Amino acid sequence: MIKNIFFDYNGTLINFEACEKEALRLAGCNYGKLITTEEIEIYQKINSALWERYNAGEISRDTVLVERFDKFLQIIGLNIKPEVFNGFYLDKLEDLFVLEPHVTETLELLSEKYNLYVVTNGVQKLVMNKLFNAKLSFFIKDVFTSERVGYHKPSLEFFSFCLENINAKPDECIIVGDSLTSDIVGGIESGIFTCWYNPKKISNNSNIVPNVEICDFADLDFTIYSLP
């Protein structure tokens, strides 16, 4: 019986892509550069590839945060230290939040039935502030970031830490997330039920099979209720 729900943060509760684009544009303008849509797409490819390496345990989070802009700034010809650009970008990102549709009302409903948690490889300060600003922190019992845990999703150690801290068995939990390689793999390997949040209805051509799939948060309550 499900008692606890782990939510991924970026791309699941928060429409991170919208926030990311605006923060990039603001950072570019601050340093005299109008960043185009095409350039944002270049950044997203660089950033995504680095986070994949992080999820695979090949590089550290700090390396991701700096190296992504080291490469990107060279490509767009902006002569700014990547550490400086990253700092400004994160400050702006902290102030921005765009919720995925139906998140607030769904969390409010689910919080009356389950214990809700956030599990993320995101930055601790950023996540905590965004949850507060988005008025979601009231529904969330605890936040587990890779920074706090010392391991990152999808590692077994990350989820073991979470389960131990909430005193729960794997079959009492479900993880809801948009990443097959991070959220769903981590849940499967930890024995946790998995729900793939797939709002863009992307085809799953991998061998990673979640227990359930939703494209709208409004369907989550019934989906979890219907689990065996």
Functional labels for PLM-detected ranges:
Residues M1-I5, E17-A18, C29, I80, ...:
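Asp-based, Mg2+/Mn2+-dependent phosphohydrolase catalytic module
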Residues H102-K113:
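Catalytic-core regions built around general acid/base machinery
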Residues K113-Y114, G191:
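Glycine-centered short loops/turns at secondary-structure junctions
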